[in-house]
C-alpha cells in the first residue's frame, strides 16, 4: 500500500525546493551577467542577460589577439592578460605548496610534541591572524624594501616577495591541520617506531598519507586566497608585466574609460584556475572539511 504524504510535508518540501532554487539563482545571476557583458559589443556594464548580438572582441583582446573593426581600425590588446594569468597561477601555486608544507610541519609539532609555551604560541598565532592584512601594508612595504637590498629575489616588485608575504598567513591552517592530526590514533606512529621508523619517517610515511583530505582543503583555500588577493600584491608589484591578474584587472577600470567588456572577459579567465583546482581536488574536499574540526 502506497504511503501518502500529508499536505504539510508536501508544502515544506515545495518551499524548501523553491528557496534552494532562489538561492542558486542569486548565486548564478552575477556570473551569468559577467559572461553576458564579455560577449556584448562595446564596453557597457548594462544590458540584457542574453546579448542581442554576440561579439568575441573582448575575448580576442584578453587572449592577446588584435581586433579589426568594420571601418578598418585595428585595436591591439591593451594589456598582457595571459601573462597576468600565468603570474597568478605561478604565485598562487607556489604559495599554496609552501603553505601546505609549513602548516603541516608546524601542526605536527603542536599536535605530537611537548614543549614549553605551546598553548601560548597557538593562541598568539590565532590572535595575530585575526588582524586584517591591510593594517600591515606599511610595515610590509618597509620590510620588503629593506629585504630586497640583501635578497633581491624577495624584494619589491618580485613574485618571490609576494609569495613570501602570503606564506606568513598560516595560523588558521596550522589550527585546522592540528585538529585533523589529533583525530589520528597515535598508536600508528608508535607501531612505525617499533619497526625502526624515525619520527620524520613516521610523519612522512604514516601521518601525511592519512591526512591528504585536509591537506587538499588547505591547498585549495590557500590557492584561492592567493590568486584573488589584491592589497598586498598591488603594494609590492610595480611593473605591469609582473602583475597578477587580480591586480592587473584594475587597469581596465580607469576613471576616464571603463572597459567593462574587457574586464568581464578577464574576470571569467581568472575563475578558470580556481575551477580546475577545485575539480581536481573535490574527491578529498568534503572529507577534509568535515574532519578538520579543531578539538578542544
Curated annotation (Swiss-Prot):
Function: Part of the ABC transporter complex MalEFGK involved in maltose/maltodextrin import. Probably responsible for the translocation of the substrate across the membrane.
Keywords, comma-separated and alphabetical: Cell inner membrane, Cell membrane, Membrane, Sugar transport, Transmembrane, Transmembrane helix, Transport
Gene name per UniProt: malG
Periplasmic side: 36-88, 144-152, 228-257
Official protein name in the record: Maltose/maltodextrin transport system permease protein MalG
Parts of the chain on the Cytoplasmic side: 1-12, 112-123, 176-204, 281-296
An annotated GO BP: maltodextrin transmembrane transport
A GO molecular-function descriptor: ABC-type maltose transporter activity
Subunit structure comment from the entry: The complex is composed of two ATP-binding proteins (MalK), two transmembrane proteins (MalG and MalF) and a solute-binding protein (MalE).
UniProt key word Transmembrane: yes
PROSITE patterns: ABC_TM1 (PS50928)
Domain (ABC transmembrane type-1) ranges: 85-281
Single GO cellular component term: plasma membrane
Family of the protein in this entry: Belongs to the binding-protein-dependent transport system permease family. MalFG subfamily.
Membrane spanning residue stretches: 13-35, 89-111, 124-143, 153-175, 205-227, 258-280
Membrane protein topology class: Multi-pass membrane protein
Subcellular location: Cell inner membrane
Alphabetical list of InterPro entries matching this protein: BP-dep_ABC_trans_perm, MetI-like, MetI-like_sf
